[in-house]
Amino acid sequence: TKAFITGFTTWGTLIALLKNGDPVLGAMNQPFVGERFVGVAGQTTLNGQQLRTRACPRLEQARLGITELEMMHTDAQRDAFESIASRVEYLRLGGDCYNYALLAAGHIDLVIEGDLMPWDIQALIPIVEGAGGVISLWDGAPVHGGGWVVAAGDAALHAEAVAHLK
């Protein structure tokens, strides 16, 4: 990944176990800082300690992460992203797969990204969902094949974000 090549610490090794094409177990190993996130139905752990997302039902209270603004290729995508980014409490650039781990741990509340491949996201789905979060495509559809992704630690926040992104 770009983060690994450039020496940033936000990269990770992603492994997903699929059942009938759906991710049922996900692992993200971040060897630089010695963290391993593992997610299955109803549970996500960091080095064996259970994680939960943070309750944050409104955009104005949310901490948003995105890897890079260049993920938004069209004016419509940039406008949709900006309609959310302009309302959140904090916006953090960078993060790559680590953004989803931070969401599962309750440090950030929302991740919005674009043009992801299946191998970019499949391991992160059980990690987000196991910690209590919601993850989908921008239109609310399942994300398993990659695409334009929105993940939130709170279902109400996810619904509000999807309404802006559709």
Spell out what each predicted region is:
Residues T13-L14, V134:
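PAS-family sensory domains
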Residues T1, L64, V128:
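Conserved S/T- and glycine-rich ATP-binding loop of Class I adenylate-forming
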Residues L14-Y100, G147-K166:
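Acidic beta-strand-loop-alpha-helix segment within the catalytic core
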Residues T1-G12:
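Glycine/serine-rich anion-binding loops at beta->alpha junctions
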Residues D79-S83, A101-K166:
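Oxyanion/phosphate-interacting regions
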Residues T6, H73-Q77, D120-I121:
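Alpha-helix N-cap/helix-start motif
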